[in-house]
Structure formats: structure tokens, C-alpha cells
Design a protein with these regions (language model features):
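Active-site-proximal specificity loops/subdomain of glycosyltransferases
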Residues: 35-89
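Short, aromatic/basic amphipathic alpha-helical patches
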Residues: 28-43, 139-142
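A glycosyltransferase accessory/donor-loop signature
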Residues: 158-160, 165, 169-171, 175-336
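Short internal beta-strands
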Residues: 14-24, 125-127
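Short, charged/polar "capping" segments at the starts of alpha-helices
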Residues: 24-32, 132-134
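GT-A fold catalytic core of metal-dependent nucleotide-sugar glycosyltransferases
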Residues: 80-138, 180-181
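Histidine-anchored nucleotide/phosphate-binding helix
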Residues: 1-11
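Short, surface-exposed amphipathic charged segments that create phosphate/polyanion-binding patches used
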Residues: 58-71, 138-142, 239-245
């Protein structure tokens, strides 16, 4: 993200304070993230908050609310997503923030988004293109969700969303993976309480818990932001995002995660960035572990993969990787 962001605006220097909400992240990985950030320390800072080790009000409530999820939601999502409902309490020092998911790749400058006037909106977000998943009406979305519920073993009951509510979601298909959040207005309007109250009435009936909540509770007060701030890779090349240079953030929501298969859209670009971090040995090990999937690649993607790998297999990296494997073996032996 920081390699793509502007460092000043109208002659004023910008500073990016990044807050990572984590769940039992190891001290080793925290240090790796800090090392990855160090080249950008002149205009950025990073802090970590472990929600499982924090007894403050917002995080204890998050743990309680997570217990109300249906089995499907508990398996698909972490309790981290519920932190979005309590952003005003988690970050009392700010009036406005940008929040984004971690399954993302920044390919452009997002700083301009922060200065977007809110005009009485609780938050700004982009809309998904539902036509990409063959949904062209509220009825299509309703049927899709019914089938999804049955497939996931979620029973329909009085807490399930009504056709009218699904219609609201269809008309307002906002994706919560990137949000410009007006925390000052949240506090003024007691929005957190409204979100929690609505959640308690529907809890186990929600398939996309916090995203559905935001749309249904905040409808009419959501600012539609340019889709460039939250682009699914499949959107590139469509009328919404004609080319990659039109995007600021690629968001790998749904199942096509770039670390799962090198043939997925923009997997190569994601790996190029990942190899520049302090996690390069883990990234390489993951690629090796997925080697069986490469037989599924077409000839173009196979060539692309081996050309990419060839640029990474230098002497220095291979020595680092061997030392990494030795350390992991010793660590495993010592912990027996």
C-alpha cells in the first residue's frame, strides 16, 4: 500500500498511521511486519492490537456476539469482522478512518479517498457488480441466498432476511472490504448501538453478517465511492474497470485467493509483492506446497509461473530459505 501512496497533498506532508487488528498473531510475525514496514518509516507508523488479549469493552463484546453466529458464519468468518461494528469505540482518537480487508493488493494511490467529503454519510464504500455472478434482479439475489442457506445448512426461520430486505441489499450492493468511516457521525448518532441492536434480532439468520447489517441499518446514508477503491480482479476489463491502471485496490473476496493457486487472476502480481516482504520464505514454501495445482495451468500460465520463479531463485534467497527450513526443524524439535 505505502509504495503506491502519495507522500504529500497540496504541499502538506502526509503520514499514514496503520492499526492492525489481529487475533493471536505471534511475536515473530509481528516483527516481520514491522521489518516490512521499516523502509516507509519516514511517513508511516504501525501498531498492533490483539483482540484476543484485550479486555477492553469493544473486544469482549465482539467475543460475545460471535457466539451468536450460525455454524456456517462461524466457519467462514472470524470474529474480527464484528470489530467493524465497533470502530468508533475501538478508535476513539479519530474522527475519520479508512478500513480495509487483508486479502487485498494495492496497485494505486488511495490517499485521495480519505479526503472525500462525507456529506452526512456514515461511511463510504463501493458497490459490487452483481452481474458478474449472474444476479440481475432482487429475485435472483433472493433465490441465490436461499440456495446458499440450504447448501450451508443454515435453517430458515424468523431471523432470516425477508424478500424486502434482500431487495434493499440488491439495490445497495456495497462491499465492506474498503470503507471510509465517519467516526464522528457514528458517535453523534449512536450508530454502534443501532448496529448491535439489529444484529441481536437477526444474528444466526445473517449470511454476510456485518456487510448486511451496514446496508440495512445505514441505507440512505452510505456514500457510494468510485469502484477503483475496491476492485475484484474479475472486474478488470469490464465497463467498470477497463484496465488495471484504473484500480487502486484489488480485493480478492470470494474463493479465488491468489496464494491458493497461481492461475487465479493477479496471483502473479500478488506474489511479486509478497516476495518483497519479510515473509518471502513462507511465500516460497506455500508455492512449493501448491505445486500439484500447476498441472491445471494452461501453457501461458505455466510459462508465466516458471519465468516468475526464475527471477526469485537467486543464491542469496536460496541460502535464506535453507536457513529458514533449518530453523523451523529446530523449532519443531525443541517444542516436542
Amino acid at each position: 500500500m505505502l509504495s503506491s501512496c502519495a507522500q504529500e497533498r497540496d504541499g502538506v506532508k502526509l503520514f499514514y498511521q496503520i492499526h492492525c487488528l489481529v487475533d493471536s498473531l505471534s511475536a515473530e510475525n509481528i516483527e516481520k511486519l514491522k521489518r516490512t514496514m521499516s523502509p516507509f518509516s519516514a511517513f508511516s507508523g504501525i501498531e498492533f492490537c490483539d483482540i484476543s488479549k484485550n479486555d477492553a469493552y469493544p473486544f469482549t463484546l465482539v467475543s460475545q456476539l460471535f457466539l451468536r453466529f450460525n455454524p456456517f458464519a462461524k466457519k467462514r468468518f472470524s470474529k474480527m469482522i464484528l470489530c467493524r461494528l465497533l470502530l468508533a469505540s475501538i478508535f476513539p482518537q479519530y474522527e475519520k478512518i479508512i478500513m480495509f480487508d487483508v486479502d487485498t493488493l494495492f496497485v494505486g494511490d488511495i490517499s485521495e479517498g480519505f479526503f472525500t467529503p462525507m456529506d452526512g454519510a456514515y461511511f463510504g464504500a463501493t458497490k459490487e457488480d452483481l452481474s458478474l455472478i449472474n444476479i440481475h434482479s432482487a429475485n435472483d439475489l433472493f433465490v441465490s441466498r436461499l440456495n446458499w442457506s440450504r447448501g450451508m445448512g443454515v435453517k430458515l426461520n424468523h431471523k432470516s432476511l425477508t424478500f424486502q430486505e434482500v431487495g434493499i441489499l440488491y439495490e445497495n450492493p456495497f462491499n465492506a472490504g474498503f470503507m471510509l468511516v465517519n467516526l464522528a457521525l457514528w458517535r453523534e448518532s449512536h450508530l454502534e448501538e443501532k448496529l448491535i441492536d439489529f444484529f441481536k434480532t437477526r444474528d444466526e439468520g445473517l449470511l454476510l453478517p456485518e456487510q448486511d447489517l451496514f446496508v440495512l441499518v445505514c441505507q440512505g446514508r452510505i456514500l457510494e465511492m468510485p469502484c477503483k477503491y475496491n476492485v475484484h480482479p474479475r472486474m478488470v476489463g469490464t465497463r467498470m474497470i477497463p484496465k488495471k491502471s484504473d484500480a487502486c485496490m484489488l480485493h480478492f473476496y470470494a474463493d479465488e485467493k491468489p496464494w491458493k493457486h497461481f492461475g487465479y487472476p493477479y496471483s502473479k502480481e500478488w506474489h511479486q509483492v509478497a516476495f518483497k516482504t519479510s515473509f518471502e520464505s513462507l511465500v516460497f514454501e506455500n508455492l512449493v506446497g501448491k505445486i500439484e495445482t500447476f498441472t491445471e495451468l494452461n501453457d501461458h500460465n505455466k510459462k508465466s509461473f516458471f519465468e516468475f520463479l526464475n527471477t526469485k531463485l537467486n543464491k542469496k534467497f536460496l541460502i535464506q530459505y535453507i536457513l529458514f527450513k533449518i530453523f523451523k526443524k529446530l523449532e519443531s524439535f525443541c517444542l516436542r
